[in-house]
């Protein structure tokens, strides 16, 4: 009851990930059913896969609220100034073919643009490929992100891309050191996107 929903014409964060659990009360206030899509027509739009362990829902919450610590220790209202859109680009089982990553991402962006053509939005690509180390060289996926962000100079888009993950094979005490030693994952090397990495000790 303390969350004030965003206005209907508010800008959106469009999360490209494993979907989102719209039934969650903190998500439903900002995610309309028509703004929840899946790249593949036979996929469920919900974040239902055990394989991804709710990653899309977690990223949705983070995109909407950020750090909720002040709200948890207080009793004031929280006004949301942006909406949420989610497009499921990860299958519930298995993986997409790497050669399709660029196409899937472009199709997801197009779906969001078509669904609400006049809405301003930021795209959050919350998944990466942990395959070969590209050492910053462009790939078809990163090049497509660059192309979508530039938009021929007219229909430009703001893309936030995950830097990737540190392997759980390393002991926790080495985590910060490994961040300095590890390369970002594909397509975070895109030039026209903002690459974001984060850590919390909460």
Model-derived regions, located:
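Active-site core segment of subtilase-fold serine proteases
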Residues: 2-86, 113-126, 155-156
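Short helix/loop capping segments that flank catalytic or ligand/cofactor-binding pockets
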Residues: 23-25, 170-171, 196-198
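Short glycine-rich loop/turn motifs that provide flexible caps or phosphate-binding loops at active sites
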Residues: 55, 163, 196
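Hydrophobic residues at beta-strand termini and immediately following loops
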Residues: 87-89, 196
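Substrate-binding/access-modulating region of protease and related hydrolase catalytic domains
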Residues: 90-190, 200
């Amino acid at each position: 009851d303390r969350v004030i929903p965003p206005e209907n014409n508010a800008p959106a964060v469009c999360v490209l990930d494993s979907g989102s659990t719209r039934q969650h009360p903190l998500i439903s206030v900002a995610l309309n059913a028509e703004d929840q899509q899946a790249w593949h027509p036979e996929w469920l739009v919900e974040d239902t896969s055990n394989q991804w362990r709710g990653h899309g829902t977690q990223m949705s919450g983070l995109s909407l609220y950020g750090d909720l610590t002040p709200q948890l220790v207080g009793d004031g209202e929280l006004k949301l100034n942006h909406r949420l859109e989610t497009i499921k680009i990860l299958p519930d089982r298995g993986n997409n073919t790497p050669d399709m990553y660029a196409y899937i991402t472009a199709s997801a962006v197009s779906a969001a643009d078509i669904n609400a053509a006049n809405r301003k939005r930021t795209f959050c690509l919350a998944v990466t490929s942990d395959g070969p180390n590209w050492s910053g060289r462009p790939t078809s996926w990163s090049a497509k992100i660059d192309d979508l962000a530039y938009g021929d100079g007219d229909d430009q888009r703001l893309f936030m891309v995950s830097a990737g993950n540190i392997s759980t094979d390393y002991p926790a005490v080495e985590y910060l050191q490994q961040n300095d030693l590890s390369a970002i994952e594909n397509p975070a090397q895109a030039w026209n996107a903002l690459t974001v990495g984060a850590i919390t000790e909460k």
